[in-house]
Amino acid sequence: MYTLSVSSLNEQIKALLEESFSRVLVEGELSRITFHSSGHIYFTLKDENSTIKAVIFKANAAKLKFQLQEGLKVILDGAITLYKPRGEYQINCFSISPAGHGALALAYEQLKNRLASKGYFESSRKKQLPKFPKRIALITSATGAAVADMLRVAMSRYRAIEIDIYDVLVQGDNAAPSIIRALSLADTKGYDIIVLGRGGGSIEDLWAFNEEIVADAIFSAITPIISAVGHEIDWVISDFVADLRAPTPSAAMEMCLPDEKELYQFIDSLVARYEQMISQKLYGVKQELEHISRLYQDHSIEKKISYKLEEIAQLKLSFTNSIYFKMQSFNKEVESIKIRFPNAIQSRINIVQNQVLTLQKMLESNHPRLKTKKGFAQISKDSKVIDIESLIVDEVFDLMSDRVVISAKVINKKNI
C-alpha cells in the first residue's frame, strides 16, 4: 500500500464521483441560499435526515424562470462533483425546477407578489387615458394577426386617429428586450396612448409580458399604457402594471377610441341643446330690454319736462283767469265810480287804468314761457330752475325754450 497526498486523494474521489454521478435528479428543500456578486448561486439542499451543498453557476442561473427561496421544494438536475480545496462534494446544477409546481407558474406568482408589495398595481398610480386621443403607438409584431385586427377596429371607429406601429418580437428569449427598446422609444414621442399587444398563445408564448424588466419599463413610462395580450382568459404581469388591461387587442381599440358615429350624434344633440339655451336666453334678454325701455320712458327727462310744462300751462290759465275776473270786477267798479263821479275822478281812473295795464305787461313779460318766446332760455338742473351764478365749471345743466330743451356743460365762467 502506498501513501497518497490529500490533493491526490481528492482528485481521485472527484473523478470517481463525476464518473458515477454524471447526471442526477435530486429532490429536496432549499436552505442557506447565497446570491454571489459573480452571478453564481450557492445553497444547501436538505430533507428530514441530511443535507448536501449545491451550486448553480451564472450561465445556468440566468435561465431560471423563478426566484430561489428558503424552504422551497425543488428538483435539481445536475452532476456530483468535488470541491478539491476543501474536500467537499456538491451538486453542480444544470437546471432547477419547483417540485410539484410548474416553474413558469411559480415564477409568475413570485413576481406578481413581489411587484404588488412594491406598489406596481396600485390604482392611485394609474394614469388616466384621454377621451379623444390623436396619436397612438402600437407595440406588437407587424406581421401578426393582432395588428391587423387593431387597425381594422381603429379605422371603423375613429378615422381621425394617427397610428404608428413599432415592430417587436413578441415571444422568445429576445422578446422582452425588444419590447423594452420600443416602449422606451415610443414613450419619448409624445403619444397619447401606447398599446402593448399580441394574440393568444401558451404561457411560454406570452412569457415576455411576464418578465420583470418589462413590468419595470411599463411602471416607469410617462405615457398611458394599455396591455392587450392574448385572449380574455389570459392574464400576464403587464396587465396588472399597465394603466388599463384590455381582454384582447381588438378590445383595446374599442376601449381607447371613441365611436365616430356616436360622437357625431352627441355633437348634434349638444348643438341642439345649446341652440335652445341660447334662444331662451335671447328671449329673456329681449323681455328685460323691453321692460327697461318702458321704465325709461316712464322716468325720462322728456317725460318730466312734459309734465312740468303741463303744470305751468295749468298755472298760467288759472292765473290769467284770476286776473281776468279781477279786471272785470275792477272795471265794473271803475264804471260805477265814473258814473257817480264823472268829472272829479276821471283823471284818477286813467292813472289806475295805466297802472293796471303796466302791471299786466309786467306779469306777461316776467312769465318764463313768454320770455322763451322772445329768444330767452330758462336755466334748470334736475327739472329745477336755478340761478346761472350758481353754476360751476364742468357742471351739466339744461336750457329750455318754448320748443326745445338743450343739455349744456359749463366750459368757462367769468364775472362781468
Curated annotation (Swiss-Prot):
It holds the Pfam family Exonuc_VII_L. Its EC number is 3.1.11.6. CDD domains: ExoVII_LU_OBF. It catalyses: Exonucleolytic cleavage in either 5'- to 3'- or 3'- to 5'-direction to yield nucleoside 5'-phosphates. The keyword Mitochondrion does not apply. Transmembrane segments: none annotated. InterPro entries: Exonuc_VII_L, Exonuc_VII_lsu_C, OB-fold_nuc-bd_dom. Disulfide bonds: none annotated. The keyword Cytoplasm applies. Keywords: Cytoplasm, Exonuclease, Hydrolase, Nuclease. It comes from Sulfurimonas denitrificans (strain ATCC 33889 / DSM 1251) (Thiomicrospira denitrificans (strain ATCC 33889 / DSM 1251)). GO terms for cellular component: cytoplasm; exodeoxyribonuclease VII complex. One of its GO terms (biological process) is DNA catabolic process. It is found in: Cytoplasm. Belongs to the XseA family. It comes from the Bacteria. Heterooligomer composed of large and small subunits. GO terms for molecular function: exodeoxyribonuclease VII activity; nucleic acid binding. Bidirectionally degrades single-stranded DNA into large acid-insoluble oligonucleotides, which are then degraded further into small acid-soluble oligonucleotides. This is Exodeoxyribonuclease 7 large subunit.
